[in-house]
């Protein structure tokens, strides 16, 4: 029986391994945890979420919602698990982290054609079909081998993880429930600040003691996961137009709008833990307690998880990969996940499905396929394989990646609806083409 190595038991690796297994292909899935830990993983589970517990919007006419619909057409394992681990989060699809990772692990272990190898991979096997899905925390040894294979220096920047707080330590007399603009159910907890409270918080934040490491001014951060203190340094109102924007959040029983608002999102099914939305940070733990407790409602906050920084590694995909995710220099190697330069949980998982599809087709001697550029997945693959290699930066799913409608549609809501309808038709065609 033919075999594929899948290196990395994260979101992309699990999707790739599962797809291959469903096609009757033997898989060796390599995961270095718990033999070798990372700076942010807490368990040995497959598919562990280490940043937010939100998989972003599930609204059908959004880019993130469309991405999920496309993945469901392709038989996504992770979205099936996510539905079973879902927690209230308004229009977003958020999950209980532990339950989600447990379900993913169970599904993989239940596949008889998948052999789970709990070992670190230092070198990509020579002469064997492999999918590299080692993620943002690729080990130094494997990163060195990838540099040898690709002839390129990997690019590094630093993602930041937001703190999580015990629900019973929150002062609910100062906090109100609501979702922005009333979309979905009122699943978010909102901590309103007046101008004086915000300015005090802001001054403390920009003068916070930051963990030692790479210069905060020289580090590269992807905007979707930028540390709050870095956002704050861009200007006094940067947070108020970012994660602390008050628009669409009316204080119950008051005609006055808050000057700024911190949102908290439920992270577990029991509702005992809430995460600070958009407040990834690299502050020292003591500083996190001191500064975040300045926010009304968080004065006695018990932090069950502090914000931390971790490295993200990704390759120069425009130089190295075809849209099929096959390596140009080594055709027996495919890449998937954040290491390809996609950003986001579902984006990473989607590339795992595509890598699995094309690894299977390569084994079978069939032509490699990618979804049409009018699909979100196809547009992402086109972006990472055809962008300028001189200043390549990670990208997440958004409608701006899609080709314009012909003729143009001026009304945004109608345009987005047209994008979705066109994409779903194209993804349906792609799914049918896989039968050949």
UniProtKB/Swiss-Prot annotation:
Disulfide-bond pairs as recorded: none
One GO process term, biological-process aspect: tRNA methylation
Keyword NADP: yes
Gene3D superfamilies: FAD/NAD(P)-binding domain
Organism: Syntrophomonas wolfei subsp. wolfei (strain DSM 2245B / Goettingen)
Compartment annotation: Cytoplasm
Protein's name in the database: Methylenetetrahydrofolate--tRNA-(uracil-5-)-methyltransferase TrmFO
UniProt keyword terms in alphabetical order: Cytoplasm, FAD, Flavoprotein, Methyltransferase, NAD, NADP, Transferase, tRNA processing
Role noted for this protein: Catalyzes the folate-dependent formation of 5-methyl-uridine at position 54 (M-5-U54) in all tRNAs.
